[in-house]
Curated annotation (Swiss-Prot):
Residues 32-218 form the BPL/LPL catalytic domain. Its main location: cytoplasm. It comes from the Bacteria. In the reaction, the free carboxyl group of octanoic acid is attached via an amide linkage to the epsilon-amino group of a specific lysine residue of lipoyl domains of lipoate-dependent enzymes. One of its GO terms (cellular component) is cytoplasm. The active site is at C182 (acyl-thioester intermediate). This is Octanoyltransferase. It comes from Cereibacter sphaeroides (strain ATCC 17025 / ATH 2.4.3). Catalyzes the transfer of endogenously produced octanoic acid from octanoyl-acyl-carrier-protein onto the lipoyl domains of lipoate-dependent enzymes. Lipoyl-ACP can also act as a substrate although octanoyl-ACP is likely to be the physiological substrate. It catalyses: octanoyl-[ACP] + L-lysyl-[protein] = N(6)-octanoyl-L-lysyl-[protein] + holo-[ACP] + H(+). NCBIfam families: lipB, PRK14341.1, PRK14345.1. Its EC number is 2.3.1.181. GO terms for molecular function: lipoyl(octanoyl) transferase activity. Belongs to the LipB family.
Length: 218
């Protein structure tokens, strides 16, 4: 395990306060005043807009607060029952390759899901992690349905990463209906509990910790 500092934040973390704290931590990491960090938390129900968000993808603008996140990507939902991992790593030291970093985040999610015998997969042109749903009716094209279980969106400031990923453990999946998640209309969303797995947040956190160093060796 590297010297990354891990924190599990209790309760529901207010979005703007958390973003400000994250930006301060990124500056401290860049200045050499603080170690790299991973924060595990939950937010109250809200939508965030990434730098590629399209107005038409905010279907219900009055349903929950909407925050401009400044990260890459489009609209996503955060709320109770979803584990958010904010990942603040020094890519100046680990390698200045944004694409590789995003792939490493996907690898981390895939390895974490495998701890629960869930096969997470990448899809070209669709950042995030997906699961095939043979238990559901095929899509309009006759192909097996695929649902998104994890979203990824990052930003770099002087080669220190922030924002990160979210994994759906047991959120209210109907809350995603207020947006077009990540701008993708033809696929749905799922969660570990929706897949029939009695996983707790503590189980998920332990799996994230166990698998982290495989994707982010020191």
């Amino acid at each position: 395990m590297s010297d990354v500092e891990w924190s599990v934040l209790p309760g529901l973390s207010p979005y703007q306060e958390t973003l400000s704290a994250m930006e301060a931590r990124v500056a401290a990491i860049r200045a050499g005043d603080a170690p790299e960090a991973v924060w595990l938390l939950e937010h109250p129900p809200l939508y965030t807009a990434g730098t590629s968000a399209r107005p038409e993808d905010l279907v219900e603008p009055d349903r929950f607060p909407v925050h401009v996140a400044g990260r890459g990507g489009q609209y996503t939902y955060h709320g109770p029952g979803q584990r958010v991992a904010y990942v603040m790593l020094d890519l100046d030291r680990r390698g200045r390759d944004v694409r590789r970093f995003v792939c490493a985040l996907e690898d981390w999610v895939i390895a974490t899901l495998a701890e629960f015998n869930v096969k997470g997969e990448r899809r070209a042109g669709r950042v995030g992690v997906w699961v095939v749903r043979p238990d559901r009716a095929p899509g309009p094209d006759g192909q097996p349905r695929e649902d998104k279980i994890a979203a990824i969106g990052v930003k770099l400031r002087r080669w220190v990463s922030f924002h990160g990923l979210s994994i759906n453990l047991e959120p209210d999946l109907s809350h995603f209906e207020g947006i077009v998640p990540c701008g993708i209309r033809e696929h749905g969303v799922t969660s570990l509990v929706d897949l029939g797995l009695p996983v707790t947040m503590q189980d998920l956190d332990a799996a994230l910790l166990r698998t982290f160093s495989r994707s982010f060796p020191d």
